[in-house]
Design a protein with these regions (language model features):
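ATP-dependent adenylation/nucleotidyltransferase module used to activate substrates
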Residues: 1-161, 172, 181-183, 188
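AMP-forming adenylation/ATP pyrophosphatase catalytic core
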Residues: 130-138, 142-252
Length: 252
């Protein structure tokens, strides 16, 4: 138990993991505030309406708020769409058109989520942030080490490797010692609305995980300039044809 009751900003996605992270923060004796980062909106070009995706869909935001209400915690939704576009989505597009396959989740964690949450500490007069990632942070002298979560199947430490020391110092990872099964059970014990919610492994800003369609809508002029061509091996031998180099990744 903390000697003084500190305030923690808990990142709330609307899923079961972040909800149980909030539960654990409260059980540890901290005061908590739930924070949902609004990161993206996909707009249907025909209807001009927002298409739900995993990046803070209406259901997800409402789910986060309902969990906070149930646990007696204030909840806020903050708009970081511009930052997410600049740091993550633009890079995602540029990498594909440079012949590389990006990993947007790593950039999102280090350049958007942690940066945004840490910068909100002063706004909310808070001391720490907490997330529902399956990883652990250990202090070694003056350094903070990032370790795998005990649930090796769910371990997310790889997605956090770029997070800076100054951010790790102010981060709690309440699920690092828990298994997914244990997290589900805690959610059921607390009768949380999302206890049985399915997990999503898709990129949160790409509808139906169709990155080709996403690029076609996000940068249509670039996609229009990509032509078909031949696939050759390292010795220059033709081994097939391709429908545009952005549709393939190394080793495919």
């Amino acid at each position: 138990m903390p000697s003084n009751k500190k305030r923690v900003l808990v990142a709330m996605s609307g899923g079961v993991d972040s909800s149980v992270a909030l539960v654990k923060v409260l059980e540890m004796g901290y005061e908590a505030i739930g924070i949902t980062l609004k990161l993206w909106e996909n707009i249907d070009k025909k209807t001009n309406k927002v298409i739900d995706s995993d990046c803070n869909s209406l259901d997800a935001v409402n789910g986060a708020k309902l969990v906070c209400d149930r646990l007696g915690v204030h909840h806020y939704t903050l708009d970081f769409i511009d930052l997410f576009k600049t740091k993550v989505v633009n890079n995602f597009s540029n990498e594909y058109f440079s012949g590389r396959t990006p990993n947007p989740c790593i950039r999102c964690n280090s350049l958007v989520k942690w940066d945004a949450l840490i910068n909100q500490l002063d706004v909310f007069d808070a001391d720490m942030i907490a997330t529902g990632h399956y990883a652990r942070i250990k202090k070694d002298g003056e350094k903070f080490q990032l370790h795998k979560g005990l649930d090796t199947i769910k371990d997310q430490s790889y997605m956090m490797w770029q997070i800076e020391q100054k951010f790790l110092e102010k981060t709690l990872l309440p699920l690092g010692e828990l298994s997914k099964k244990e997290v589900r059970q805690i959610a059921l014990d607390y009768k949380l609305i999302n206890a049985n919610r399915d997990e999503s492994m898709d990129l949160c800003f790409v509808v139906d995980n169709d990155y080709k369609q996403f690029l076609a809508e996000f940068v249509p002029e670039k996609v229009a300039n990509i032509s078909n061509g031949e696939i050759v091996d390292e010795e220059g031998k033709k081994v097939g044809k391709h429908s545009g180099f952005t549709n393939y990744t190394i080793g495919q």
